[in-house]
Structures are given as structure tokens and as C-alpha cells.
Amino acid sequence: MNRIHKKSAIPQTVPLILAAHDRGESLLWGRYEEQLPLCAFTANGLNCRKCFQGPCRINPFGDQPTRGVCGADRDQIVMENLFRATLEGVLETSRSISSIDESLDGQELPNLDSDLPRQTGKRLMEHGILPVRKGQLWGVQNSFFSHKSYLSRTLMDLTRLGLIHYGFLKVLEKSFSAVRNELAHEPEGANLYIVGHPSLSQLTALRKMVRDQSGGKKVNLWLQGTRGLPIFLSFSDHGSPEMALAMGLDALIIYPNSNFPALEYLAQKWEIPILLAEKHEEIERIAREAFELALNHQKKKGHVPPSPISPSQSPGVSIFDRMEEVHESLKAGKVKGILVIWGEPNVKQAFFERTLCLMESALNQKMLVAVGGDAAVNAGLLNEELARRMGKNAADTLNAANGNLSYLHSWGEIPRLVSFLKTLSSGREFHQMPLVVSFPELVRSSAWAVAVSFLSLGFAVQVGTQLPFWGSPALSEVLLKDWPKISGGVLLTSPSLPDAQTQAREMVSYIQSRSVEK
């Protein structure tokens, strides 16, 4: 594995990295390089920690060991790793939603019939996958290392898991569809950053306290990433909340369910005050203490951040407000297809490079592009770099009023996106449309679960990160050939991950091969 030469495709990120370096920290890139060389067995799913007899590994070249201690071979071990990664992603999303609002625990998953094209729903019914219910999470069949016929059986349950995950996203959409941000950015205010998943009642109380501030210095409240709650301002963190620490943060509230363990020690190292909070603590006390810490830190900090915090800048026109226009543009050939990008930067590749390459290729081909996930938080940075790369073609394309680029800022918007695309489908299945959902960069199991959800709904899904499931040729064949038979979903990826330009050509070719319904 080569060391990292280019950390990000965003030029404005460089001063932040240098500022961190000057303060003695190489951030996630330095920690990644300390792990090199990475374990090739793990990278291909050829190791197993399921029991305490191991951990076991499989030699992919025919030499020993060819089986684990229990006797499982490469196909069974890799399928088990795939199953566990998917299940973990579904549970991660479920726990996140539950931690925000415990009342959602008692809600059953909504019916998915209205979200599926008729033929897709019929096929899933014939396979016994629909309807899906929460309780099925505990009944899905993983391989259990039983026998090889379970490869196909487990793929059926991966599809079921994908639909259950989508059901959770529908619950999220319904619960927070009426919630909107009402806070204004105070340029001279102190910046307080929340990391993790406080409850909705705590977030609502925090928002009220920020809104009710009067006189003197005020506090800006920021919520990390796109966690489905559009009630706070978001800012461009350049792909990692670690960079946020170099941008002028004054205090952090960190909850136990945060996904970023590095933030605590980095904040302590850089003398940024942190407050470790529990979910059920009195929020007024936490807020008062956090506000005081932030304001005091702002008074005494001596350094000037190389890139000060400001709200994320993105087009104000939603793709959902343009249904009729998009439909007519597709019919008239003004728009040649649709690319949906969802994902989060991965340290193994230059942040946003693959994302930008796909965006530029699609926009140059007059395709509609919708970007979601953590990439959407950095919409302003992406637009600026796209404008530089595209030159004279950029103005009309990136224009918020009539351009082909838009952003989705919440995981809870995925069901609305699916409904939007179904309306455009004219009765066809999603994989028959000039449409690709791409994950050029992904990190967490929950992001992989989103990809499985789109596959389970019958979309063509492209993945631009090396997946740890390619140690089994038999499983690779099942994933690539059998998924279309179950849901219609098409997985556009391969054991040998192509470069960004090759993957962009693959995306364009797939979309161009699907005709627009006149």
C-alpha cells in the first residue's frame, strides 16, 4: 500500500492540514500511514473473529491455511464478513435514530409498496422478502458456516436487510420532515460543536437557548455532519471533523455515541475545552457550562484560524421543487440522465477526488447530479473546485436556479429522493432508467447499508471504495450476477478497483445505455 501523496482534492484544505502539522498533529492521514502495510487478509475479507478459537485467516493462493479452525472455507468466511458488515450498518442507523427520539422505538416500519416500481415489488414478493418488519432483524439468516447453498440464501437476507434499513430512513423522514433550522450565524460569535447523537428534546432545548441569547457575545451551535437533523447550521468540515478543530472551534460537547474518538484527545492537545455529556443529563446545565467554556476560550485563544467557520454554502433550490421541469428536460433530451452521489471521504484516497471526477463527467454530459451524505456539507467547496476544473462551462451548470447540480443535506431525504425518481420512472424499474447511484467514497457500515438499500430497491449502484468482500470469487459472482435476479439491483464495482476516470466512464456508459422514456 503506497503512502498518501495527495490528501484532498480541495485546495482550501491544505492550510488546515499545515496548521495541524505546525501544532504537532498529522491527523487521520498520519494514523493511517502508521498502520501500513495493511493486512491483505482483512482487506479481502479472508479473516474471521467470529469465535474465540481464532482469529483465523485463509490463504487465497491455494497454500495452507485453506480453512478456519471450525472448517469454514474462504467463501463462507467472506460471506460472513459481508453479512455482519451489512447488519452492523442497519443497526447503527437504527440506534442513531433511536438515540435521537426513543418514541420511534415503538413504531413499526412503514409499508414500502408505494416506493417500489410495480415489477420490483412483485419480484420481491415472489422471493418472500416483502413485506419487511423490524422483528425480521433477528430472523435474518447469515451463513452460519453451514453449507454453500447459503451463499444465495444470505444474499436474499442482505436484500431484506437493505429494505429494513430503508424503512428506518422512512421513519426518520416522517419524524423530522417538519423540522427546519431557525438559527442565524453570528460571525463574531463563539463556536460550539456537538459530536454524537443527543436526543431530539435536548437538541430542541439547545436551539431555544441559542435563539434566546441576548446582549454581548453569542454562541453559534453546530451539529457534526448530515445526521438527519436539519435544525442547526452546518459548516464545511473539509471531509473530517478533525479539520474542524483547526478552523476556530471554541468548545465541544461529545456524546458517548460519537463516531470520532480522535476528537477528544486532539481537543485536549490543542487546549480546546470539551464537555463529555450523557444522553439523559440535564441539558440546561450542560448548555450553560458549554456556552461559558466556548465564550471564555474565544476570549483567550491567540491563533487565527486559516479557514474560519462559516455556514456551508450550497444552492438554495431543491431538486424536489423541480419535478415537472426535470421530467420535461429528460423527455426533450436536455437532460441525458441522473447521477446520485452519496458518501463520505475515505483516507485511502484523496478526499473528494473521485466524487469531483464523477460530478464533472456527469455535468459535462448534461446529466442531473444530486449529491448527498457528508459530501453535501462541503457543497460550497465542491462547487468552487468544480468551477475551476470546468472553466467556462461552469457558470450555467452550477447556477442554483436552473443548473443541473443540487444537494441533499439529510439521510432522511433518501425516501423523498426515491419517490422523486419513481415519479420520473414512468413505470419502469430503477435499473432500467438512465440513472446511477454512486458511492465514490464511503467509510462506515451505515453508509454501506445505504448502498445495500438502493440495491434492494432495484437501483444500479456504483462503489468507488475497495470493499473487503472480494476474497471469494464465488461470492463475487453471486453479488454481481444474482442480485439483479432478486431486486433488479445492479452492482457496478469489481475486485480490482478502477481509477476515478475509468469509473466515471463506466457511470456515463451505463446511463447512456438506458433510454429516456418519451
Residue ranges of model-derived segments:
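Metallocofactor- and cofactor-centric catalytic cores in central/energy metabolism, strongly enriched
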Residues: 1-422, 429-449, 457-518
